Design a protein with these regions (language model features):
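Conserved catalytic/binding loops enriched for acidic/polar residues
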Residues: 458-459, 463, 489-856
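Bacterial Sec-dependent N-terminal signal peptides
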Residues: 1-24
Length: 856
């Protein structure tokens, strides 16, 4: 107690003394420096002393002993936005991880949070008018996407050092491994195993003033794979994928975004105006290069920076000049936009000291993959905030670009791999990959027809040259920002398509961005061009829209004037979203692949005749001394593929709707939706009946069947035999090409709905015509094998439609299916069956129908 009192007594004295001392000196003594002064950064020298320094946009340090990489982030780089772009350099073809695949494109930023650096993705899908008060909520309800947090391992006066392995030896930026779809057996699809970071490594680290490239080999392990993949997979348990991460400075220039328009086809960035009251609050912007005139006042001027493409030294020597000439053909289109020599083509020297994978170079390369998933591809990558194209590459597969036939079966059915989901790939890049063998199939069709007709080697060479020019121009069009125009093949009539006085002026089709059928004349003496070899009217118009320079005040009116010409039939447009290549997809039959002319039905009829003519010459032409029958089998598959393409084109006119996307002020002669007229729908059905459903539709093929033998290779024969699956493949032409679309729920409902605004072909009438085409011709005779499969398939489809549990069909369709089944039952009851096979077949049909009716 005494001690306590002493403290109470002494303490005031001490305080009083301290106060007097402060008054005397006029200021308090500074506190000890060790208590409050900020510690100086320890620096990064010790952390990077065993590393190779790579200077550039971002400074990287790679440990020379273990290969690990550290990233130095300057304080001035915090909060800034950068572009990330990933590329696959080498990997499984069937997973779209092969060379030069452009994958993830995004904007990211780096911010400091205490002792860590946060990497987050920036949402570029919204726009706010800054003059609107609601713009203050721009960041509300848009969750941050922080994909990496790393603790700083060093700091100096200018920046922070972190480990970069978690950023690059990972799937943080690009989820490389595709997602396995539910419901698909794991044995059906090859996929990667789990990422093994211990076995992954850096292949190259380079950095430049405006971009840093980090190339990594990511190792995936799967100790017990269900599917061993295709021949390019050395060992399905262990797969390495080479990827390139590119960190790119946000361009700082006077580039001005250009708005998208639904009447012309550019790749675009979707942006919603969150302060708009419009019913379509879109501020979508197109992808285009930054072209500026050297002389802004000149009607035609060279650009300050042209678009330069390098033909890589992997390109076969005999094709290099053709590619250069093809690329330069785009300059005619750019002249419509006021630019001279906008595109430049150069050939990469064999001793070049630069890497074609460097994003500063736009490269056209050739590769020869083991199992190519595409014929050629021309992706580009952009600034997502503005749409400015930053770089591009074109890759051509030897399989597609060469004039050499590949001895494999080109006519193949459904592949489960197509159902994989690719979260790391931009959807627009993925769309570029969806067409695989069509181009090669068309070229081989032309070569087969020329061979069978005894054409000279020069004629075949000219066909391939035209094909290659078209192919290069098509892929280059993608790199200029253009997406597909699957409606351009409708430009010329059958009477015009082989008139070179017309085609050498405006092209064979309206745009090189279509995937048309190769042009082959039924009468060889009238043959014109096989492929279009110039920018078409649509291409020139599209480039004019995308690249014509305008001042900010003049742009809206200038673009309106250009786009107002969209009603010109030569400028018609429809992209992949509009095309009808798949059963039940879309609605305008003029937007399709593998067809040609404004009368696609008539052109298809001629192609059926050509195929039947060539069938009679296949065995003689491709029975060659010293080789097996593998080539004959391939050629037959190519011709069967032609039939499939034509069936898919003709069948779409039944229940089709012509679409006109013009705006009201254009005063188009047609309505937005116009049902295909009854006569055209009936004509399409007649062509299908004659060339696809009739008992003699495949009569010409019979002489080929006994020769369709593949070449044996080790013990790889089909376990159930090498014979060609004739009935399966022909039924696929009939069913997948026609019936799957005609009996699709979406098609049937559209037929009924369009009755309310002009369609005169009802579901009941259409099914009645199908029933007649599939049953009437042989109702009083024996039924051949083709027809047995066809009739059984048709009846089973009707049974599936009337099933009460089915939710795919509307009531009108169900009623028509039931009525058609009962008509078939009545037909069968009085049919004449003169052999046991036909009796058995018809008894089976009656059993299927009766069983279905009893269970309803």
């Amino acid at each position: 107690m005494k001690k306590f009192l002493m403290v109470l007594i002494v303490t005031p004295g001490l305080l009083l003394t301290a106060a007097r001392a402060q008054d005397k000196k006029g200021a308090a003594a500074p506190p000890p420096a060790t208590d409050t002064a900020k510690k100086k950064p320890a620096g990064i020298t010790d952390k990077v002393k065993s590393c190779r320094k790579v200077d550039g946009l971002f400074t990287l340090y790679q440990d020379t002993a273990n290969g690990s990489v550290q990233l130095y982030v300057k304080k001035s780089q915090l909060g800034k936005e950068y572009i990330y772009q990933s590329f696959s350099i080498s990997g499984p073809n069937q997973l779209y991880l092969n060379q030069s695949m452009h994958r993830a494109t995004l904007v990211f930023k780096i911010e400091k949070a205490f002792d860590k650096l946060e990497f987050s993705r920036v949402n570029t899908r919204f726009w706010y008018d800054k003059n609107n008060a609601v713009s203050k909520t721009a960041s509300v309800d848009k969750p941050e996407a922080v994909f990496l947090v790393e603790k700083t391992v060093g700091e100096d006066a200018d920046g922070y050092l972190i480990s970069a392995d978690g950023l690059f030896i990972s799937e943080k930026l690009d989820p490389v491994k595709p997602l396995f779809p539910p419901g698909i057996p794991p044995t059906a699809i090859f996929n990667l195993g789990m990422l093994n970071t211990a076995k992954s490594r850096y292949a190259n680290v380079r950095s430049f003033p405006n971009n840093s490239d980090i190339i990594v080999d990511l190792a995936y392990d799967n100790p017990a794979p269900y599917n061993s993949g295709t021949s390019d997979i050395t060992d399905a348990r262990y797969v390495r994928v080479r990827m390139q991460h590119s960190l790119i400075a946000m361009p700082e220039n006077d580039f001005r975004s250009r708005r998208d328009d639904p009447r012309v086809g550019y790749f675009s960035q979707f942006i919603n105006d969150q302060t708009s009251i419009s019913t379509v609050p879109y501020k979508d912007i197109i992808h285009r290069w930054h072209l500026k005139k050297k002389d802004p006042n000149a009607a035609l001027s060279e650009p300050v920076e042209p678009i330069v493409y390098w033909v890589e030294n992997t390109t076969p020597l005999e094709y290099r000049q053709i590619i250069v000439d093809a690329g330069l053909k785009w300059n005619e289109a750019f002249e419509k936009a006021g630019f001279k020599n906008a595109v430049q083509m150069k050939i990469m020297p064999d001793d070049a000291d630069w890497d074609p994978a460097d994003i500063r170079y736009n490269v056209i390369r050739w590769v020869s993959s083991a199992s190519p998933t595409y014929g050629a591809i021309g992706p580009s990558f952009v600034n997502p905030k503005t749409g400015q194209i930053i770089g591009a590459d074109i890759t051509i597969e030897w399989f597609s670009g060469s004039a050499t036939p590949i001895f494999d079966e080109l006519f193949k059915g459904f592949s489960a791999t197509g159902n994989l989901q690719y979260p790391g790939m931009d959807p627009q890049h993925e769309a570029n990959c969806s067409l695989a063998n069509e181009l090669k199939g068309q070229l081989l069709t032309g070569m087969t027809v020329l061979d069978a007709s005894g054409a000279s080697a020069m004629e075949v060479k000219e066909m391939h040259k035209q094909f290659l020019v078209y192919l290069i121009m098509h892929e280059m069009g993608h790199t200029l920002g253009l997406n597909h125009n699957m409606k351009a093949s409708q430009m010329l009539s059958p009477a015009e398509i082989n008139n070179t006085e017309i085609t050498h002026k405006i092209g064979l089709i309206g745009s090189v961005m279509d995937y048309p059928a190769i042009n082959i004349a039924l009468d060889k003496s009238k043959q014109g061009d096989y492929y279009t070899t110039m920018a078409g009217p649509y291409d020139m118009w599209a480039i004019e829209y995308g690249y014509t320079p305008f001042s900010e005040g003049e742009e809206a009116d200038g673009l309106k004037k250009i786009i107002s010409r969209s009603t010109d039939p030569k400028l018609t447009f429809g992209n992949d979203g509009d095309d009808m290549r798949a059963p039940g997809k879309a609605m305008d039959p003029r937007v399709n692949v593998n067809e040609l002319t404004s009368d696609a039905i008539g052109y298809a009829e001629d192609r059926f005749k050509i195929v039947n003519q060539v069938m009679s010459k296949l065995v003689q032409k491709y029975t060659k001394e010293g080789q097996s029958y593998a080539e004959l089998r391939t050629r037959y598959g190519v011709l069967l593929g032609q039939r499939f393409g034509m069936v898919s084109a003709v069948s779409r006119y039944i229940g089709g709707i012509y679409v006109d996307r013009s705006f009201p002020e254009q005063k188009s002669a047609t309505k937005p939706f116009t049902p295909v007229d009854l006569a055209t729908q009936k004509r399409a059905m007649d062509v299908l009946t004659k060339y696809v459903f009739a008992p003699n539709a495949f009569e010409a093929d019979a002489q080929v069947y006994a020769y369709l033998q593949p070449q044996r290779r080790g013990f790889t024969q089909n376990g159930t035999g090498d014979d060609y699956r004739i009935t399966d493949n022909l039924l696929q032409v009939q069913a997948s090409g026609a019936l799957s679309h005609l009996l699709h729920g979406a098609t049937l409902q559209r037929i009924t709905n369009s009755r309310l605004y002009g369609n005169q072909y009802s579901v009941a009438s259409m099914m009645s015509d199908l029933q007649k085409g599939i049953f009437n011709a042989d109702i009083a005779t024996n039924v051949n094998v083709y027809r047995q499969y066809l009739q059984t398939y048709f009846v089973r489809q009707l049974v599936a439609m009337v099933n009460p549990q089915s939710q795919q069909f509307d009531d009108v369709s169900k009623a028509s299916a039931l009525y058609t089944m009962k008509k078939i039952k009545t037909q069968l009851a009085t049919a004449v069956s003169t052999n046991e096979e036909t009796k058995a077949h018809r008894a089976n049909l009656q059993f299927i129908i009766e069983n279905a009716l009893e269970n309803k």
